[in-house]
Design a protein with these regions (language model features):
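ATP-dependent carboxylate-amine ligase
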Residues: 1-17, 43, 182, 196, ...
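N-terminal leader/targeting and accessory segments in enzymes
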Residues: 1-94, 303, 373-376, 401-402, ...
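Extended acidic/charged loop-beta regions that coordinate divalent cations
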Residues: 22-25, 153-156, 166-194, 230-295, ...
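Mobile, glycine- and charge-enriched loop segments
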Residues: 37-46, 133, 144, 148-160, ...
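Phosphate-binding loop of NTP-binding sites
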Residues: 8-11, 91-224, 228-238, 318, ...
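Conserved beta-strand scaffold positions in the cores of enzyme catalytic domains, especially
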Residues: 82-84, 107, 133-135, 240-242, ...
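Short, polar loop motifs at secondary-structure junctions
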Residues: 69-76, 224-228, 245-248, 415-419, ...
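Short gly/ser/thr-rich secondary-structure transition/capping motifs
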Residues: 22-31, 90-93, 141-144, 164-169, ...
Length: 476
């Protein structure tokens, strides 16, 4: 981490350096909060958690070769230098923001209600065809995970793709301060985190806090088919780059009446499902230099129209960063799925759609649509969606109403709120056999008896429901 000397770190964090004067000029090689990950000349940042206080590991990290540590308390006879700070977490965020600004690198920041991770994977896959890319791994998209990702950026990296997830006002302000993106992508404004953000307008306000932290030449890349995002036509004095499906601007029915959505710069036509294995589309975009329209046929190796939007976001970013049509196509067609997010598993003749990492009304309906196109018998295993606020029951019933008429043979539900899905399906559809369970164990037992070769089974719920256990049992 070039220029990250202990003296500089103390100044950035507003802390007090305590240790050998000669060590002040030494540079750290990395920064971590997990003592098990400490390597030679690393900075250890002890964070106080609900169960574990990182300060209790300070002595052990020096034994592993740590150059220094941050500390919220004075240390007696430390084995190495330390920087005394008021808050390790605040110091870490200040250090990440400073380090990001020291780097000669393009940063793509991604947020949105649905599809952040899959869009991040798509963008990273495309940009990797031309650049050395560092991306957010796993779910490290919050106020602890984002700085840890930034600390992993090295001189060889040319682009970093950073995911930013929030659940309250002010959180994006803090994240984007660290990320300082050159390009800000917002996938959509959907119904999630309503406990704190209350309405979609609240979500829009919270997500767009990121705009204040774009670089001076930074741009916003937005879903033009979203009735909230389409309002943000100018961001920091520059036109937003809108993408969507279909050339013409769409209309949407809103509380204010019929609304015409954004004119799209990048758009897709001829969207066609290829079973459960992929989605075909033709993507159109103007060449960045000549303005002439470029047409690109792609086959995305993941099912669902929502993945076309991910590809469009990737093309929008890639166009800004100078990739060729061939590079874009190669990156889109080689993207990989990750566990718990539309991951296809084949076991004993059964196809399992493992989409149980998280859920909200928008993603739940998209997964149901994918299942509806599957061959053979179709079985859905659905659980509760969390953080939906006062309208949680109504939103679960809305999913049930969407489910009805999709030609899905059997529905299994478990969880307090998913009972609303089951009841709505029973009220709207006589085709689907509906089974509701108060807990997972009985559901798993009956599902294992029911499943047979040729079935396709969708498993989806919010993460707290623990539905990976169901996938595990199905794949034994």
């Amino acid at each position: 981490m070039r220029n990250m000397t202990l003296e500089h770190i103390a100044a950035v964090c507003g802390g007090t350096y305590i240790g050998n004067e000669a060590d002040k000029k030494r540079e750290i090689m990395g920064a971590v909060i997990d003592s098990r990950l400490v390597e030679k000349d690393y900075l250890f940042i002890p964070v106080r958690g609900e169960k574990v206080d990182g300060h209790s590991f300070i002595s052990s990290v020096f034994e592993k070769g740590a150059l220094a540590v941050l500390s919220e308390e004075q240390l007696e006879n430390p084995a190495g230098p330390y920087i005394l700070v008021k808050s390790s977490l605040d110091a870490m965020k200040k250090l990440a923001a400073d380090y990001r600004r020291s780097l000669d690198i393009k940063v793509v920041g991604i947020t949105g209600s649905v599809g952040k991770t899959s869009t991040k994977e798509m963008i990273a896959s495309v940009l990797a065809q031309k650049y050395n890319v560092l991306k957010t791994e796993g779910n490290l998209n919050n106020e602890i995970g984002l700085p840890l990702t930034i600390f992993k950026i090295r001189e060889e990296h040319q682009v970093s793709v950073l995911e930013m997830g929030i659940s309250e006002f002010g959180e994006m302000d803090r994240l984007a301060t660290m990320a300082y993106p050159d390009i800000c992508v917002i996938t959509n404004i959907g119904l999630c985190h309503l406990e704190n953000l209350i309405t979609r307008d609240g979500i829009l306000k919270a997500k767009t806090e990121s705009f204040a932290h774009l670089t001076p030449d930074g741009i916003a890349v937005l879903n033009g088919d979203d009735d909230k995002l389409c309002e943000k036509k100018i961001v920091n004095g520059k036109p937003a780059v809108f993408y969507g499906i279909g050339k013409e601007a769409k209309t949407a029915e809103t509380e204010e009446g019929t609304k015409t959505l954004a004119e799209k710069v990048i758009y897709a036509t001829d969207v066609e499902a290829v079973g459960l294995t992929g989605t075909k589309a033709v993507i159109h975009y103007p060449d960045k230099k000549t303005g002439e329209e470029v047409t690109m046929e792609v086959e995305i190796p993941i099912a669902g129209e929502h993945n076309v939007y991910n590809a469009l976001a990737a093309v929008s970013v890639a166009r800004e960063l100078g990739l060729t049509c061939e590079e874009m196509k190669r990156g889109i067609e080689s993207v990989q799925t990750i566990g718990g997010r539309s991951n296809l598993i084949h076991k004993n003749g059964v196809t399992i759609i493992d989409d149980c990492y998280n859920a909200n009304p928008v993603s739940m309906k998209a997964s149901i649509d994918v299942l509806s196109k599957a061959p053979g018998r179709k079985i859905a295993v659905l659980g509760d969606m969390g953080e939906l606020g006062a309208e949680e029951k109504q939103l679960h019933r809305m999913v049930g109403a969407h489910f009805a008429g999709k030609g899905i043979d059997i529905l299994y539900c478990a969880g307090t709120l998913s009972k609303e899905i089951a009841e709505a399906v029973q009220e709207c559809s006589s085709e689907t056999k509906v089974h509701y369970y108060g807990e997972k164990a009985a559901l798993i037992q009956d599902l294992l008896k029911e499943a047979k070769s040729g079935d396709t089974i969708l498993v989806k719920a919010s993460h707290f429901m623990g539905f990976p256990e169901i996938v595990k049992e199905l794949t034994k």
